[in-house]
Amino acid sequence: EYYPAAERLTDDILQIVPSGPFGKWRALLQADSYAVSNARKRIWIQTPYYLPSDVLNSALQVAALAGIDVRLMLPARSDSKVVDLASHSYLDDMMKAGVKILFYKPGFLHSKLLIIDDTLTVIGSANMDFRSFEHNFEVNAFIYDTETALQMREIFLQDQRECVQVFSKNWE
């Protein structure tokens, strides 16, 4: 009576991955790095803050150099000038590797989204920064489902229409 049977609505797989200042391993950083390293076609990211680990930053650059469509969407202006300056320090190398850098213009983009190959969607509370991976208590959902990934891809593309792409030659 108090615990009715849950109805199964889908066969899709959802994995919850936490992070925080506990334990030996940084599960969320490892899961994101593994997903990025195993991408074959597409890695699209929305994050308000981009202060990644060296491993994740390198994995994204290697993916772009290998011909994978890597897009990083950031707010044109975040809520912190210091964080903007720190985030921007990574972008020239990213662009030189072939990562498309997109600045969202209408307002402060606070979305945390990672789409891999139209098969994996990662959403949750974690930014793509070392604080979320190592210091803050965060949780992301890894959704292994093509339909969800395609829906998120359409949302990303809608947001991209509100962006300006930055190029290395006019960045400096």
Predicted regions and their residues:
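Charged, low-complexity intrinsically disordered terminal segments
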Residues: 1-172
